[in-house]
Amino acid sequence: MLAILLLQAAVPAVPTDWSALAPLPYLTAPQMAPPLARFVAGEIAAGRCSLPRPADGHYVVKVDVATLVGADGSVLRAVPHAIACPTVEQYSVGLVLKFARANLPPRAGAADQWFRATIVYDWGG
């Protein structure tokens, strides 16, 4: 029990003001290929997300993911901002983890730090 409490104390809490977080410092910027938006489009079409249909049919869905990065450049924790669509939130976390794998600079001697990753899904309905 004491070990669990010590671990919780060592992990920085998720910040409340995500707008103040620096962008996730990818070594190579990830590319959002059009097929990545298909899953999101399918979730909306199936009614599993309560996002309104744009008048012009062009969807732009943004998901912020607070990402805790260790000094070695590894992701320690990723927390999606709620957009009323849990499957898309978790899908976005998976993409951030994939994009960050071996793609973040080590920060020797630095403390664990929170960053913000923003995933943007863009497609015509």
Protein language model features and the residues they cover:
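Charge-biased low-complexity segments
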Residues: 2-125
